[in-house]
Amino acid sequence: MATATAKVIYDSGFKNIWIYGIDNEELEQLSQGKNLKYFPSSTQIPHFNTSNNLEQILNNVA
């Protein structure tokens, strides 16, 4: 179970899922069979909390 502070963004086909603000142990539990990309909670992700444009978010994260 992800912590309350964890955030997730994903592409339309759920082929790539970005996890932000969780530790490696939690990531391991969530990553079974999924292509997850992990960012520690200290990572600055532009527009992560401010943009509703998924494409813009993914372009900034990629």
UniProtKB/Swiss-Prot annotation:
Top-level taxonomic group: Bacteria
Identification of the protein by name: Uncharacterized protein in vlpC 3'region
